[in-house]
Amino acid sequence: SFVPGYPDWVWRRPPMSDGDWYDRFSAQAVDVDGTDLEPLFEAARTAGVWVALGITERVRSGSLYNSVVYVNDRGELAGRHRKLVPTGAERLVWANGYDDVLTTVDIGNVRVGALICWENYMPLARVAMYERGVDVLLAPTWDNSDEWVPTLRHIAKEGQLFVVGVTAYLRGCDVPRDLPDADELYGGEDDLMSRGNSSIVAPGGELIAGPLIGSAGVVTATLDLSRIPSGRRMFDPVGHYSRPDVLTLDRSEHD
C-alpha cells in the first residue's frame, strides 16, 4: 500500500488502543469509485503511460482493502486487484479480497498481473496467474527480509516470466508525530520500518536490477520479452510441463 502507506503500527501497538491510528489511515485511504484517483488519471493521460499503484482502498461500508489499481495511458481505471488474505496483524486493518481478485491487464501484447506481498507464497494463486498467461508479475510487498529476493527469483523461474518486486524504504521519522505514542513507538532516521528490497527478475531467475536496500530510489530495467517463450520451451508450468489429468486448479470466478 503506497497510498496512504503501510499500517506498520499493527505490529507495535495493542489492537484495542490503535483507534486514532486506524482513523487517520482510513481517512486517507482511496475511494476508487469516487474522485480520489483523478490526479493519477490526469498524470497518466498527460505522460501517456500505464501506472500500477498499490493503495489502501476504502469502500462505502467502511471496509479497507490492500489493493493494486491499474490506470491506462488514456487516464482510465483499467483494473483492480484486492489482496486475497491479509497477513497476520494486517487483518486488524484490511479485509479479505472478495472480488476484483487475480485481475490481469493487457498492455499492448504484454499481460501484467499482481500478487501482493505474501500472496506470492500461495501456490494456487501463482498457478492461477500462470494460467492467465501473465508475462510480467508485479509483487509489491512489505517483506524486506533476506528471503524475499530468492522468493522472487523462484517465481520468475517457476513461471518463466518477469517479476517486478517493489518494497518501500521507510524510517521512523516518516511517521506523523501527532499520533498517540508516536515518539515512543518510532525513532528517527535510524529506525528502519522497511529497508527497501526492490528488485526486477528475468525469466529463469536472473536478477537484472536491484535489490535497492538502504535508501530511497527508483529501480528500472529493459525487459527482453523474447526470453519468455525461450524459457517456456524448457518449462511451461501450465502447458507442456503440466499434467492436468493428475493435477488441476479449480477456481471460483467473480464478475
Predicted features by range, described:
Residues 1-14, 21-24, 44, 51-52, ...:
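Active-site beta-strand/loop signature of hydrolases that rely on acidic residues for catalysis
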Residues 3-9, 69, 81-87, 199, ...:
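Short beta->alpha transition motifs characteristic of CBS
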Residues 12-13, 68-73, 155-157, 180-184:
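Short, hinge-like loop/turn segments at secondary-structure boundaries
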Residues 16-35, 186-193:
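A short acidic, glycine-rich active-site loop
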Residues 23-46, 148-178, 250-254:
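Short, compositionally biased leader-like segments
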Residues 29-32, 37-42, 57-136, 141-154, ...:
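Active-site catalytic loop in hydrolytic enzyme cores
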Residues 50-55, 83-89, 179-185:
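Short Pro/Gly-enriched beta-strand edge/turn motifs at strand-loop
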Residues 104, 168-255:
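C-terminal beta-strand edge segments of enzyme domains
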